[in-house]
């Protein structure tokens, strides 16, 4: 890669239609896990103008009012007026859930005992990543993109910018020099708005109240290109502007394109699905590698076969930044982390109703107390085993 290059990531707000769908799916998952933590859940959501469709496969003993959960989630996001794209009070909600296929269940149903040989719920490959670009050990472009739309939502909710509406998108381009963030080149922010706000006032407020307070001062060098609502108008938004579907923002959910993605979405899936749980474990492993000082960048790939507990492969790539060899780090990963599906569930305590919070602003790089995969609690053990000093202070 060139020594001087630009890299871009994007995020979307909680009011983006695909994120509305993700949040409904994870709200339903949480409600089910709160009653029956051994449920099998694959909850998919579609939302369009005035319509929400709930479908997928659910096997549970829980008694859940799915329609009310969907309405409550839409209300929490802020869609309480048809002018915004959907109204939680008046939208139709259709429910079409089946049970999990018994052919799949027979390979993963050993979850009620201490047998760690519970098989993976599907085949697939998952990635985890961490780097030292931010204190959260995340790539800078996706980190800033999330913080922009998160601030947009906060200013909308507290009334400081009352003309903001729930739907929004952000995009940040960072200039890298010698592999490190050097400066911010371009920021794009498109936000849904009330029809009576004029464009110059909107652009000034977004730049001064949302964008500038979010950007790190040490990365503001020269003129930054600010592109705010570049089409000129964004009144029609949310599910009215675009049909929303669960699982369509998988790059937003992870590393903003800075790392590969195995293709499996997260939201609506219980942790027996390795699409979700193994991706969380990959982040946990990668973050501990970087926090331990073993490397400044770490990419982990794991893969599984349906019904088989042991991963079919584990790979570590530190892109030449490792203080010990990638082979040594891979050996340490196998020694310190149980990457069998049941082992992951126990290691990260994943049978909890914690998932709705993950469904907007990124599954990774957020210091939420429920996000066990963000802990660096194995960094010291890894550092000691490798004979290096930890890169971050570890309690």
Swiss-Prot record:
Its EC number is 2.5.1.6. GO terms for biological process: one-carbon metabolic process; S-adenosylmethionine biosynthetic process. GO terms for molecular function: ATP binding; magnesium ion binding; methionine adenosyltransferase activity. It catalyses: L-methionine + ATP + H2O = S-adenosyl-L-methionine + phosphate + diphosphate. Pathway: Amino-acid biosynthesis; S-adenosyl-L-methionine biosynthesis; S-adenosyl-L-methionine from L-methionine: step 1/1. Keywords: ATP-binding, Cytoplasm, Magnesium, Metal-binding, Nucleotide-binding, One-carbon metabolism, Potassium, Transferase. ATP binds at residues 16, 167-169, 233-234, 242, 248-249, 265, 269. It is found in: Cytoplasm. Residues 100-110 are annotated as: Flexible loop. It is an enzyme of class 2 (transferase). Belongs to the AdoMet synthase family. This is S-adenosylmethionine synthase. It comes from Burkholderia thailandensis (strain ATCC 700388 / DSM 13276 / CCUG 48851 / CIP 106301 / E264). The lineage of its organism: Bacteria, Pseudomonadati, Pseudomonadota, Betaproteobacteria, Burkholderiales. The gene is metK.
